[in-house]
Amino acid sequence: MAIFEGSFTSASTLKVGIVIARFNDLITNKILSGCLDCLKRHGLDTSELSNQVDIVWVPGSFELPIAAKTLMKKKSYDVVIALGAVIRGETSHYDVVISEASKGISQVSNENNVPIIFGVLTTDTMQQALERAGIKNNLGWNYALQAIEMGSLIKNLN
């Protein structure tokens, strides 16, 4: 019986793309910082001159799938991380954005056989978003760990 798992020790060989929504940037900037910190601590070069990590900013979470798709056509990535923050308001806009962003990200991932980590916070309040972006825990770190694990797993399976 063969057992395959992702590795956290081979992260330094990964090529990572990050697509990030500018909307709610108070939150998304914090998530990005946590994400980059984790990648750096696991051996990736996150400097501005890095050819290991690319970052693409988009207006909002709805635009994440098309940016991820376009990014993957431009270069070869082992994994992409989609970051955003959607906070429930008084209208149904929240439901539409989350539904379409999650479907689109999943579709792009499956079509390109590249894992895309769904790092879009979905919260009812700004306070909940702040807690998940660093006050209590920075989920950006968790999203980066998922990316390292999935990127190395798919690399090993191929």
UniProtKB/Swiss-Prot annotation:
The gene is ribH. GO terms for cellular component: cytosol; riboflavin synthase complex. The keyword Transferase applies. InterPro entries: LS, LS/RS, LS/RS_sf. PANTHER family: 6,7-DIMETHYL-8-RIBITYLLUMAZINE SYNTHASE, 6,7-DIMETHYL-8-RIBITYLLUMAZINE SYNTHASE DMRL SYNTHASE LUMAZINE SYNTHASE. Belongs to the DMRL synthase family. Its EC number is 2.5.1.78. CDD domains: Lumazine_synthase-I. This is 6,7-dimethyl-8-ribityllumazine synthase. SUPFAM superfamilies: Lumazine synthase (SSF52121). Pfam families: DMRL_synthase. Pathway: Cofactor biosynthesis; riboflavin biosynthesis; riboflavin from 2-hydroxy-3-oxobutyl phosphate and 5-amino-6-(D-ribitylamino)uracil: step 1/2. The keyword Transferase applies. GO terms for biological process: riboflavin biosynthetic process. It is an enzyme of class 2 (transferase). 5-amino-6-(D-ribitylamino)uracil binds at residues 23, 61-63, 85-87, 118. (2S)-2-hydroxy-3-oxobutyl phosphate binds at residues 90-91, 132. GO terms for molecular function: 6,7-dimethyl-8-ribityllumazine synthase activity. The active site is at 93 (proton donor). It catalyses: (2S)-2-hydroxy-3-oxobutyl phosphate + 5-amino-6-(D-ribitylamino)uracil = 6,7-dimethyl-8-(1-D-ribityl)lumazine + phosphate + 2 H2O + H(+). Keywords: Riboflavin biosynthesis, Transferase. Catalyzes the formation of 6,7-dimethyl-8-ribityllumazine by condensation of 5-amino-6-(D-ribitylamino)uracil with 3,4-dihydroxy-2-butanone 4-phosphate. This is the penultimate step in the biosynthesis of riboflavin. It comes from the Bacteria.
